[in-house]
Amino acid sequence: MLRGCGDSDSSPEPLSKHLKMVPGGRKHSGKSGKPPLVDQPKKAFDFEKDDKDLSGSEEDVADEKAPVIDKHGKKRSAGIIEDVGGEVQNMLEKFGADINKALLAKRKRIEMYTKASFKASNQKIEQIWKTQQEEIQKLNNEYSQQFMNVLQQWELDIQKFEEQGEKLSNLFRQQQKIFQQSRIVQSQRMFAMKQIHEQFIKSLEDVEKNNDNLFTGTQSELKKEMAMLQKKVMMETQQQEMANVRKSLQSMLF
């Protein structure tokens, strides 16, 4: 009959286990006046009674407490599982929040480093452009002044030639000599202008070449700085992520 009562549960426990949990006292007496357990099925499976109703005679405790213990044990196990699941869910949510914070901090650092790099690059390019414009303006002013000086000297030479031609119109030899001298002077002036022009072109080419070298060097430095910056950010990010993972694992384990 006791086995029939135990079959009502999906996972019945051995009768010896229930009997071990019953407190020691008087043995079951036939004079107790209580009917057998088979005549009281409702009392054996009445799980809604309080613990006070289960604290009767020792014989009632031995007959009625076994199924009640099974039910309460299952309820406590389900509650413990729910508590553990809630704690795991809270730890996972906290872990996800830490990862999101780390990713946001990483993104802010990358944006800050990128803005700083672009700002420094723009400043360098503006400085190079300003230097180039100043050098070109300086060369223009310098060679313009030299051209003006040569032109003024040329005009003075022509004026002298005309004056001397008028004065020495009657003296052919002297006029021829002066003409030859004037041609020589003009050739020298033309040669000087040609040299100045060639120097001007060469100076412009040198300036452009230097600027190209400066741009190339600046670009190489920028690439190196960006590579170093990327490596630094990746190392910091890995360290931060490892620290977060270690912290989360410690909080989960301890």
UniProtKB/Swiss-Prot annotation:
Modified residues annotated as Phosphoserine in this record: 8, 10-11, 55, 57, 77
Stretches for region Disordered: 1-65
Regions of compositional bias (Basic residues) in chain numbering: 17-31
Interaction with DNA, as annotated region: 71-76, 106-109
Modified residues (Phosphothreonine): 218
Presence of the UniProt keyword Translocase in the record: no
Domain of life: Eukaryota
Motif Nuclear localization signal, residue numbers: 106-109
Compositional bias ranges of the Basic and acidic residues kind: 40-55
Keywords for this protein: Cell cycle, Cell division, Centromere, Chromosome, Coiled coil, DNA-binding, Meiosis, Nucleus, Phosphoprotein
Gene Ontology terms, MF aspect: DNA binding
PTM remark: Phosphorylated.
GO cellular component: chromosome; chromosome, centromeric region; condensed chromosome; condensed chromosome, centromeric region; condensed nuclear chromosome; female germ cell nucleus; lateral element; male germ cell nucleus
One Pfam family here: Cor1
Coiled coil: 84-241
Subcellular location: Nucleus; Chromosome; Chromosome, Centromere
Region (Important for oligomerization and fiber formation): 87-92, 249-254
Statement: the UniProt record of this protein carries the keyword Hydrolase: no
GO-annotated biological processes: cell division; cellular response to leukemia inhibitory factor; chiasma assembly; female meiosis chromosome segregation; female meiosis chromosome separation; female meiosis sister chromatid cohesion; homologous chromosome pairing at meiosis; lateral element assembly
Tissues/organs with expression: Detected in oocytes. Detected in spermatocytes and testis (at protein level).
UniProt subunit comment: Component of the lateral elements of synaptonemal complexes. Homotetramer; the tetrameric helix bundles assemble end to end into long homopolimeric fibers that exhibit a transversal striation with a periodicity of about 20 nm (in vitro). Interacts with SYCP2. Forms a complex with EWSR1, PRDM9, REC8 and SYCP1; complex formation is dependent of phosphorylated form of REC8 and requires PRDM9 bound to hotspot DNA; EWSR1 joins PRDM9 with the chromosomal axis through REC8.
Domain notes from UniProt: Composed of a long central coiled coil domain. The N-terminal and C-terminal regions interact with DNA.
Protein task: Component of the synaptonemal complexes (SCS), formed between homologous chromosomes during meiotic prophase. Required for centromere pairing during meiosis in male germ cells. Required for normal meiosis during spermatogenesis and male fertility. Plays a lesser role in female fertility. Required for efficient phosphorylation of HORMAD1 and HORMAD2.
Similarity comment: family membership: Belongs to the XLR/SYCP3 family.
Stated name of the protein: Synaptonemal complex protein 3
Source species: Mus musculus (Mouse)
Gene name of the record: Sycp3
